């Protein structure tokens, strides 16, 4: 029985809010039109090559592209003034870029929530100017259709990061475990955050196994990486496997890789990795020292794939 619908919400770059579909739809005078496109699987193109006399071709990889979504909204109003106000509010919720004058500026956020999968978000910017479609003056009819085209530079739908951590309760050295998992369909680029002072040793295991049965294994099943000794003035360190970020940096964003003797982190967490305990340890620290593991949750679709 089909007894629930997806809820589609917009959190504007100006702080505004609109519910476009689902419970509460149209309360702000705007609701989702029909035939939205680009919401489903993330855009992927595969790369193939063939030699001069090869029959067929050989797979060489894939490229994940930015996501373009095309949709329309119906803007309503009970009077000419109300329609203009709703139309203006909707337009101000969007921009082509993050406001360069606002230190807290942000992109527009689209959220789709389903009962099974919960909320998943995209960060969006306009890729071209919004259009307008109406046979008559909307100030007379109280209704107009606005086609929209927007781009998500990060094409994966995302949820709040999963957090786990460990804290040194006493003494200057100790060891413990943190729990890691990746229930999504995408490789996970984790982030470690450690306190200072201290010298931390963090896991960087390789993984093997079928989906839902991944375990540390393969070439480096017990590999660890020792971070450089951190002084209190450095304020701690972040290890970020996102290739667009500094891999190891202190709280002042100073690159620490030059102090690591040529060692760095190698391994992503594969899709559908079950909960697994990972070892962490520290020396030369103080009671209360701790480590936090941030686990991003990225999905290629707005629902499903668990």
Q: What is each residue range found by the language model?
A:
Residues 62-122:
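Long, hydrophobic/aromatic-enriched structural stretches that serve as scaffold segments
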Residues 160-306:
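Intrinsically disordered, low-complexity segments enriched in serine, threonine, and glycine
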Residues 104-157, 298:
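Short beta-strand and beta-hairpin "edge-sheet" elements
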Residues 50, 54-84, 141-156, 278:
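Oligomerization/assembly interface segments of phage tail-like spikes and tubes
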Residues 1-48:
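Polar/acidic, low-complexity leader/linker segments enriched in S/T/G and N/D
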Residues 33-70, 131-136:
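Short, solvent-exposed beta-alpha or beta-beta edge segments that form flexible loop/patches at the rim
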Residues 63-67, 102-104, 140-144, 184-186, ...:
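Solvent-exposed loop and beta-edge segments used for protein-protein assembly and interaction
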Residues 3-11, 108-110, 201-207, 246-248:
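Short polybasic amphipathic segments
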């Amino acid at each position: 029985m089909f007894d629930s619908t997806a809820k589609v919400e917009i959190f504007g770059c100006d702080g505004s809010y609109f519910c476009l579909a689902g419970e509460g739809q149209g309360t702000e005078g705007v609701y989702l039109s029909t035939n939205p496109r680009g919401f489903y699987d993330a855009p992927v193109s595969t790369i193939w090559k063939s030699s001069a006399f090869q029959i067929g071709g050989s797979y060489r990889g894939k490229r994940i592209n930015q996501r373009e979504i095309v949709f329309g909204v119906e803007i309503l109003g009970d009077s000419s003034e109300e329609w203009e106000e709703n139309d203006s509010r909707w337009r101000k919720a969007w921009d082509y870029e993050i406001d360069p004058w606002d230190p807290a500026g942000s992109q527009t956020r689209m959220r789709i929530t389903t009962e099974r999968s919960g909320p998943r978000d995209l960060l969006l910017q306009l890729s071209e100017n919004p259009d307008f479609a109406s046979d008559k003056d909307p100030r007379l009819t109280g209704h107009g259709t606005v086609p929209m085209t927007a781009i998500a530079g990060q094409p994966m739908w995302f949820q709040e990061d999963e957090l786990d951590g460990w804290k040194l309760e006493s003494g200057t050295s100790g060891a413990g475990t943190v729990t890691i998992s990746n229930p999504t369909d995408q490789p996970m680029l984790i982030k470690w955050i450690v306190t200072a002072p201290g010298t931390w040793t963090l896991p960087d295991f390789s993984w093997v196994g079928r989906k839902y049965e991944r375990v540390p294994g393969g070439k480096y099943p017990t590999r660890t990486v020792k971070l450089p000794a951190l002084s209190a003035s450095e304020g701690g360190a972040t290890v970020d496997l996102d290739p667009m970020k500094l891999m190891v940096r202190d709280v002042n964003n100073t690159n620490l890789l030059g102090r690591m003797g040529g060692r760095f982190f190698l391994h992503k967490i594969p899709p559908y990795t079950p909960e697994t305990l990972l070892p962490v340890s520290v020396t030369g620290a103080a009671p209360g020292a701790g480590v936090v593991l941030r686990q991003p949750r990225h999905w290629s679709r707005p629902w499903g794939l668990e």
